[in-house]
Amino acid sequence: KIGLFGQQAPGFVDLHPDPFALHKTFQGCILEHVGLSDLIQAAEATDQANLDADRKLNVPGAFAERVDDERSSRLYLALKRLVEAENLDAVAIRCWPELPRDYGQWPYLAITRLADEGLPVACEGDVDGALTMLCCKFLGCGAPYISDWLEHDHSSFVCWHGGMCPTCLTSHEGPGAPVIKPHFNNKKPAVVDATLKSGMDVTVCRFWVCDGAYHAVICNGRSKPPKR
């Protein structure tokens, strides 16, 4: 079961889910909608004792300092509680514009923490991205990471996305180690700024729907240092 929090991000028409194709192709896989208002309500209703306990924890990885840690903890605990309550196997969340605009907090630090715990989470309401990540998890591919494809040449491509990479895929010290920062765009908290480790064997893959049918692309590669 995949939970969609909100809808796909504005303008991302290709990410509009097809629940019927999903259910038919992937043997009964269910898409469940959860409103962003339900998420925010759950975040605001977080028990103070649980909130205080979570804020004392270090985030997995190399960083310990937190940015606006109360709201980040609220989102993390609310997402975790809703995932457990609805028995979700993966999540796609509309991470903008409502959460940073209306709640004052990007969900990326919470997403990173959930990803480090093994939950496939796709941003921008990307249900097929969450589906791809879930399949990778079931196949034992390791921690999945969803990213934009920025540019490429004949043998490599550059991937980048704003702030929710699992820390297990990053270096834990030195340049590129994860650091919590405000978002580069609107300066609201909190994103995880990090660089993928070099020398990892990787599987690049994607499911998508076209004309009511699912398609897939998959290839193998190896991570290397970015040029810039």
Predicted regions and their residues:
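A charged, amphipathic alpha-helical module
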Residues: 1-104
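Anaerobic metallocofactor- and corrinoid-dependent redox/one-carbon enzyme cores
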Residues: 19, 24-27, 71-80, 84-228
